[in-house]
Structures are given as structure tokens and as C-alpha cells.
Regions:
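Glycine-rich oxoanion-binding loops at beta->alpha junctions
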Residues: 79-110
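Bacterial Sec-dependent N-terminal signal peptides
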Residues: 1-12
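Conserved anion/nucleotide-ligand pocket segment
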Residues: 168-241
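Glycine-rich, aromatic-lined ligand/substrate-binding cores of catalytic
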Residues: 211-293
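Glycine/threonine-rich flexible loop motifs
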Residues: 119-131
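Short internal beta-strands
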Residues: 57-67, 148
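Glycine-rich, charge-decorated loop segments at or immediately adjacent to ligand/cofactor-binding or catalytic sites
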Residues: 70-75, 146-168
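Conserved functional hotspot residues or short segments at active or partner-binding sites
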Residues: 258, 263-368, 388
Length: 388
């Protein structure tokens, strides 16, 4: 999934997986479970191949949402398989096999779990949820845990409400803001330090830091982290656009610009038109084959997007242009249990839906969580590995 628009602008950044001399000696003689996917690359080589070339014993690969190759749809169940190149089994942790793969019987076969995966730093992006599941599995079996760190492309700021744990779900596992600003290694340290693992347990944890990275580094991803986050602009907009998943509005799945556009057949006063189609990575997108009217955000300046942080202006704009009841707007059409609260699971609180219905502005809504954001920034400070 390497894409031409993804170029490594922060060329001096060295990811954890590239620092072979740091982690290979620590892993020699141990049976390894590797949590990774298509983003676990160092140049043109996968971390799995680097480990094998250095004589390490990788027993099993754990794959997240979208699978080891990163091609499955969002939410699609992924079956377990075998890596064709190495013959190593791949255990999917996003499907019916998850419970068995994380059982004590299976985890007891390895000595350490190593994480190397590119995250995007948002509470509803599921890779960190899988990492926490693996941390819990490791500590339950007295196994070690290691994170080969990678930059957070949304690590420049912290924003959004803290998750109300009554909305804990597969798209939100921890009491953190939507945009937490942490790398996966920092987040793992915080999970351990704050007692967020089951029964407050702590897993034996080692991290290999990135070099030449700060939280203000504009690190451009060399590989798209998932099928519908194809550009840096979509990654920067993601903290503000993803909430459309909990509404009747399309955010562009099934087009060439997912997470960079939004619209609906009934949006009024909008000149931009698009039609979601069945494509790889979005086989059955919302509003499939329906002409949508909406907004095109592709010409927005990246730095302006970053400066505004979590920006609910797009959601409020769509709500006003639809001219429907708040309940109709937040009906995403899915017919599974809990679908009516999917927006709340994404935003993390019951309050925002009512604030939008009451006509509050994006800035007024943002002000309601400002104190919690500052408190979280102080809470996370002991776990930071990089300059803010």
C-alpha cells in the first residue's frame, strides 16, 4: 500500500524497528509473538524479515483490524492464515479467532510480544486497542512486552473529551481524549503506569524509542496505515471527520477521497457532488451508488487543520445543511446492537449530540472539555519519551 503521495519528509527520524542493535540482543533466544501489519516496514524491508535475518525466533504474527496486509475493510472480520514468505502463522485479533489467539494456552507458547505498527494517535483508531489486549494477555501469562516505537502523525496536540467509560467499546478502550498526542510506546507506558490493565497489573515493558523525533515533528507516513487513510490530509482531518461514521452522512468511503469529503443526498446548498462506489477497502460504503451533495476539504491547508485541532465545524455544517431532527442526523442506518450510540462511542460522551442540537458552536463545545485536556496533559507527562 505504498502510495506516491506519502514521502518521508522527516528524513532524520529513525523508527524503533530500524535500531536493530538495540532490540536484537534483547530478543535473542526468546520465542517472539510479533504484533504488526503492512506498516511495519524499515525502508523496503518488513520488521518480520529483519528479525528472521538476525536469527530471531518469531513464532507467531498477530494482526489487527484490516489484517496483516492492511487490505480488509473497516470492521471486516479477518481470518487467521499463514505468511506465505516465511511460513509463520498469522493470528487475526480482529475476528472470531481473537479469544483463542489470546488464550493462556496460546500465549504460553511464546516468551515476549513485540509491537511494531504505525498508529495515527486517535482513541477510535483500533490498533492501540489490540496492543492493550496483547498487554493484558502477556501479563496474565507472565510474559514480557516490547514496543518498537514509531512517530504519531497527530502527536502535535491533545484535544477532545475524555472517554466516559460507559461508552467503552472496540473504538474506545481507555479514559483518554480523542486526540491523545502519544506514540504507542508512550501510551503503553501510560497504560502500565496508570494501572489500566486488568486488575491494575503491570506487564514487564521495554521500549525502543524513535531517534530525532519530537511531538512537533511533521512526520509524513511512508505507507498508508489503513485502506481509507491514504493521504496526510486525511490523517490530519481524521480527528474531526470520523464522527460522520455515527451519522447518516458519508465521509467519502467508496470514493478517491475518503475522510477528505463529506455529503448526503439531502444536504442543501452544497455544490460539490460525489457518489460512493464499491471499491477495494470499501466494498459496501454508506450511501452506496447514491449521489451526494457536500463539501470538498482537499484544498484546506494542512497547518490550518492542525492548528484547529479537533474541529466540529464540519459536523455542525452538515447538520444544518440536512435540516433534519438530531436523532435522524445521528442515525447511521446500521442495524446492530448499540448502533444508535455509535456517535457517542466515537466522541466518548453523551453531551455533544445535545450541544449540537442546542445550536452551540464548535468553539463553545470545545471549551467544555478544555480543563479535562489540561488535566490529561499533566497526567501523561511522566510517560513522555519525546519533547512536546
Amino acid at each position: 500500500m505504498a502510495i506516491s503521495i506519502f514521502t518521508l519528509s522527516a528524513q532524520d527520524v529513525v523508527v524503533g524497528a530500524a535500531q536493530v542493535d538495540q532490540y536484537v540482543p534483547l530478543l535473542k533466544g526468546k520465542k517472539i509473538g510479533l504484533f504488526s501489519n503492512h506498516t511495519g516496514m524499515v525502508g523496503d524491508r518488513h520488521t518480520l524479515d529483519i528479525m528472521i535475518e538476525n536469527g530471531l525466533d518469531v513464532e507467531v504474527i498477530y494482526s489487527p483490524e484490516h489484517g496483516f496486509r492492511g487490505t480488509a475493510d473497516a470492521g471486516e472480520q479477518v481470518s487467521s492464515s499463514v505468511d506465505k514468505k516465511t511460513g509463520i502463522r498469522i493470528e487475526s485479533l480482529y475476528g472470531s479467532n481473537k479469544k483463542k489467539a489470546l488464550s493462556k494456552e496460546e500465549i504460553s507458547k511464546i516468551d515476549i510480544i513485540v509491537t511494531d505498527i504505525q498508529d495515527v494517535g486517535l482513541r477510535f483508531y483500533t490498533y492501540y486497542c489490540t496492543m492493550v489486549d496483547l498487554m493484558n494477555a502477556a501479563v496474565a501469562c507472565n510474559k514480557e512486552f516490547m514496543v518498537l516505537d514509531r512517530p504519531n502523525p497527530n502527536g502535535m496536540y491533545v484535544d477532545g473529551p475524555i472517554l466516559d467509560m460507559k461508552y467503552k467499546s472496540g473504538v474506545g478502550k481507555l479514559p483518554i481524549p480523542v486526540v491523545h498526542g502519544l506514540t504507542l510506546a508512550e501510551l503503553a507506558l501510560m497504560v502500565n503506569g496508570e494501572g489500566w490493565l486488568d486488575n491494575g497489573a503491570k506487564v514487564p515493558l521495554q521500549v525502543v524509542k524513535c531517534e530525532n523525533y519530537t511531538h512537533q515533528t511533521r512526520y509524513v507516513l511512508p505507507i498508508a496505515p489503513s485502506p481509507n487513510l491514504r493521504t496526510m490530509k486525511s490523517i490530519y482531518l481524521y480527528p474531526s471527520i470520523c464522527y460522520f461514521e455515527g451519522t447518516s452522512v458519508s465521509l467519502g468511503r467508496g470514493t478517491d477521497a475518503p475522510f477528505e469529503i463529506y455529503g448526503h443526498p439531502d444536504m442543501k446548498g452544497c455544490d460539490f457532488i460525489f457518489t460512493p462506489r464499491s471499491v477495494e477497502g470499501a466494498k459496501n460504503p454508506p450511501l452506496l451508488n447514491k449521489k451526494c451533495y457536500g463539501r470538498d476539504l482537499r484544498n484546506l491547508d494542512d497547518e490550518e487543520i492542525i492548528a484547529k485541532g479537533l474541529n466540529l465545524e464540519y459536523l455542525i455544517d452538515a447538520y444544518k445543511c440536512m435540516g433534519v431532527s438530531v436523532d435522524a442526523f445521528f442515525d447511521n442506518g446500521y442495524k446492530y446492537a448499540g448502533a444508535k450510540e455509535f456517535f457517542e462511542k466515537l466522541i466518548g460522551t453523551a453531551d455533544v449530540r445535545k450541544m449540537i442540537a442546542d445550536g452551540m458552536s464548535a468553539d463553545e463545545i470545545k471549551a467544555t472539555w478544555a480543563d479535562d485536556v489540561e488535566a490529561f496533559k499533566a497526567q501523561r507527562k511522566p510517560y513522555l519519551l519525546y519533547e512536546e
